[in-house]
Design a protein with these regions (language model features):
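Glycine-rich phosphate/ribose-binding loops and adjacent secondary-structure elements
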Residues: 2-39, 183-198, 203, 208, ...
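Anionic-ligand anchoring segments at beta-strand to alpha-helix junctions in alpha/beta enzyme folds, i.e.
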Residues: 58-60, 206, 224, 368, ...
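Extended active-site and interfacial segments that coordinate phosphate-rich ligands
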Residues: 45-49, 249-298, 373-418, 428-456
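Short, conserved secondary-structure transition motifs
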Residues: 71-77, 139-140, 144, 456, ...
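Flexible, glycine-rich loop/tail regions that form catalytic "lids" or insertion modules at the edges
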Residues: 66, 79, 295, 312-359, ...
Length: 822
């Protein structure tokens, strides 16, 4: 560390900065020999590609410190064999040893402790330490800021156990690395943040750092050695659009390098964490427990995507399979896609939500190398193949000087497509062939036919809750309905089939500053696509958008069995009372539903709200232990004694409680609430983990309005209901697209929001992972506002009007919300 750069990596959270929001945009590329011929020329061509992508990188106030650059190649066995006498040990045959590139503390004491921990773990895992090698570097060639945070860089050589094949060695090296990360980061070493293992493999090695592209061979001098050979080379130049550069966050990672942003990262992390409790693998056996947590906190979105790729690949899937699972193409509305390929995608949708966002991902395991584009094609990828079997792919054309007459074929990556080179089979594999091979792995279509149903397959309920017109005004008051909600939101939505449009600009107070009782929804704002992250036009690009979701207890993502698609498919997340009753009375396979009340006793005062939430969370845990797979969180039953818990608070509290408990993937959470009525309300509930939402009071309110003649005479109730549901669906798609997200499945649990005016303790406990840059009220204020609305609803008729509050959020009203220009 130094005064110039007081951090060893990414700075800690402070002020308005939070390292959870790290993203970057970059240049990627690779070069490979289709024949698998190793040469130093491939390495040098990779370096040249990296240098020619330098304009896609960046530097800060120090022009010699880059945002990060790196190169991945195959293990240069001939080079290490030649260096063996100087290293003091001989290297075994290729495939019988692994090499790790290790970033270590600069302090000698801390470094020796880290080395000792790694050596201990290697021995405990049954492998043999051959020795350590100081990686020859030239620190004088990099900028002063890069030097200030530069780790000590060594290589470790590990021999496999007798009779261990190379795939088993790769898995064991993975276990060793995960154990070393966990144990060293758990120490109190002052310089433990320097520790990082860029690669530990028997197939590949990574040279990377806080470098500019032209510095890579000056810093890592051995890359210029003619004996450093490879049949493939993956390179990356980083541009930290809104992040702090660091040595750890330079690409490539162990399997991928990435240009883009994973917009759904928080949700992907949460779901991966929830799945850990059921992970089983015959390849890992008991070692699977040593890999937890799978996703390493504190990494970038690309690093966490690589964590997921690494687990799924080493558990037995091919890299193209894994990439198609994590970043699927748009399949739902594609009528030209073969049914078997569509079945492949739908089966895996039951296992894993897409890691969504603009992305061009290049990947390799040291044998195959390729690239994948996101479903929207929002990042560039250009490739060419020469007559002598050289393949080049990069973020742009022209990264290598190749004569036109030497080019056999060239093109660009299309949205959702894969470009693949197999150096062992010595051939280029087309996207069509990759998808056909994946679709033929299992009888996915048959599994779906036998195990997946929709709501239409469930029997009709014998009883559906009808509208209670006598109490509707009381319930509207209790849930904070205003006259403006009815006339400005609900009526236009049900008349026109789309969300009402208003002019830009808000001159009303923030929820935390208002003197009117507020809904919890009003304390949240959705983040939106910015910098290099484009939004999507959900209308013109409807082919890539999807509202599909899957309800059911999730299986083990490391195995492919028919029971993994034992799911109930929902085509729309907002459901009617009739469809909710179908779910409430479901009796099919493992599906069993129960209702949990979202109510708190008003007489208990402000403290009762928190106690009731804790009780709700305990009830959810007990329901899971009792075998229930559908938990319906309901606030029906509001009366003089009970007030509703804010539905968003209850939903997020249960969702995060079950994630921490490791049982979230065993249940679907369905919200039956009188509170949600506009698009943002539904987006928030879904964004914090709801599988479906039943807005029973909004539906009853529309029915009451229809009954009272608020709609044109010729408008039937069926048309009113369908138009309202259509408006919510269209509004949700528009809301997803503002953040560059295409599918509901990715949006669920992704928490693409920031709070404004909620205090840190409330957010950390109930909305874990949500940004709260500006703090404010706590749970006691939320309880007070809920009680105020309840008291207003329960006032005797002679003490109050029968009307609702006027509102005044969208238009100034005398008794309504204050405006800047009243």
């Amino acid at each position: 560390m130094s005064e110039l750069y007081p951090f060893r990596g990414v700075p800690p959270a402070q002020g308005l900065y939070n390292p959870q929001h790290e993203h970057d945009a970059c240049g990627i590329g690779f070069v490979a020999s289709i024949e698998g011929r190793k040469s130093h020329d491939i390495v040098m061509k990779g370096v040249q590609i990296l240098i020619n992508l330098a304009h896609r990188g960046a530097c800060g106030c120090d022009p010699q410190t880059g945002d990060g650059a790196g190169i991945l190649i195959q293990i240069p066995h001939a080079f290490f064999e030649r260096e063996a006498p100087d290293m003091g040990f001989s290297v075994p045959s290729p495939g019988e040893y692994g090499v790790g590139m290790v970033f270590l503390p600069v302090d000698t004491h801390d470094r020796l402790i880290c080395e000792g921990i790694i050596e201990k773990i290697v021995r405990e895992e049954g492998l043999t330490i051959l020795g350590w090698r100081d990686t020859p570097i030239n620190g004088n060639t990099i900028g002063r800021l890069a030097r200030a945070s530069q780790p000590y860089i060594e290589q470790i050589f590990v021999r496999s156990a007798t009779g261990m094949d190379q795939d088993a060695l790769e898995r064991k090296l993975y276990v060793i690395r995960k154990r070393a990360e966990a144990e060293i980061l758990a120490t109190d070493l002052k310089e433990k943040d320097f520790f990082y293992i860029p690669s530990l493999s028997s197939r590949t090695i990574i040279y990377k750092g806080l470098l500019l592209a032209p510095q890579i061979t000056d810093f890592y001098k051995e890359l210029l050695d003619p004996d450093v050979t490879s049949a493939l080379c993956l390179v990356h130049q980083r541009f930290s659009t809104n992040t702090f550069p660091s040595w750890k966050l330079a690409h490539p990672y162990r399997y991928i390098c990435h240009n883009g942003e994973i917009n759904t990262l928080r949700g992907n992390m949460n779901w991966m964490y929830a799945r850990q409790s059921v992970l089983q693998s015959p390849l890992f056996g008991d070692d699977i427990k040593k890999l937890l947590p799978i996703i390493t906190e504190g990494g970038s979105d690309s690093a966490m995507l690589d964590n997921a790729v690494e687990l799924l690949t080493l558990s037995g899937r091919s890299l193209p399979h894994v990439m198609s699972m994590l970043i699927p193409e748009a399949w739902d509305h594609d009528d030209t896609m073969p049914d078997d390929i569509k079945a492949f995608y739908e089966y895996h949708a039951s296992l894993m939500e897409p890691w969504d966002g603009p992305a061009a991902v290049a990947f390799t395991d040291g044998r195959v190398i390729g690239a994948k584009l996101d479903r929207n094609g929002l990042r560039p990828g250009r490739f060419l193949v020469t007559n002598d079997g050289l393949v080049v792919l990069a973020s742009e054309a022209g990264v290598l000087p190749i004569k036109p007459e030497d080019v056999r074929m060239k093109g660009r990556l299309a949205p959702g497509r894969i470009f693949l080179v197999d150096t062992e089979q010595k051939r280029l594999i087309t996207d069509e062939e990759v998808k056909k091979q994946l679709a033929a792995r299992q009888p996915y279509a048959q599994w779906l036919k036998e195990n997946q149903i929709t709501l239409d397959h469930l029997p009709s309920p014998t009883h559906v809750q009808s509208t209670d017109h006598d109490t509707i005004r009381m319930r509207q008051r209790a849930f904070g309905y205003t006259d403006e909600d009815l006339k400005t939101i609900l009526l236009p939505s049900a008349l026109n089939g789309e969300e009402p449009i208003g002019s830009m600009g808000i001159d009303t107070p923030l929820a935390c500053l208002s003197d009117k009782p507020q809904m919890l929804f009003n304390y949240f704002k959705q983040t939106f696509a910015q910098v290099t992250n484009p939004a999507i036009d959900s209308i013109r690009e409807g082919l890539v958008m999807s509202l599909n979701s899957y309800i059911g207890s999730e299986g083990n993502i490391l195995e492919e069995t028919p029971k993994n698609c034992h799911t109930l498919k929902l085509r729309h997340p907002v459901i009617s009372n009739w469809r909710l009753e179908k779910l409430r009375r479901v009796s099919w396979g493992s599906f069993l539903a129960t209702s949990l009340p979202m109510l708190f006793r008003v007489s208990g005062g402000e403290q009762q709200l928190e106690a009731s939430i804790e009780n709700l969370c305990r009830s959810a845990s007990l329901a899971i232990k009792s075998g229930y797979t559908l938990l319906i969180l309901t606030d029906r039953g509001v009366n003089h004694e009970y007030a509703p818990i804010p539905s968003l608070l209850a939903m997020s509290a249960v969702h995060n409680h079950l994630i921490r408990e490791g049982t979230r993937n065993q249940v679907a959470l369905i919200v039956e609430s009188g509170e949600p009525r506009e698009v943002m309300h539904f987006a928030l509930l879904l964004g914090y983990g709801a599988s479906a939402v039943n807005p029973y009071l909004a539906i009853e309110t529309l029915e009451d309005l229809h009954r009272s003649g608020a709609f044109p005479v010729e408008t039937t109730w069926d048309k009113v209901f369908k138009s309202y549901m259509k408006s919510i669906d269209k509004g949700l798609l528009k809301t997803f697209s503002k953040m560059g997200i295409s599918t509901l499945q990715s949006y669920q649990g992704a928490q693409i929001f920031e709070t404004i005016g909620l205090n840190k303790s409330l957010v950390e406990k109930y909305f874990t992972g949500t940004s709260s840059r500006i703090q404010g009220v706590g749970i006691e204020v939320l309880a007070r506002e809920a009680i105020m609305k309840h008291d207003f609803a329960m006032q005797p008729p002679h003490l109050s009007d029968t009307e609702l509050r006027v509102g005044g959020e969208y238009q100034y009203r005398v008794r309504g919300e204050r405006h800047l220009l009243n």
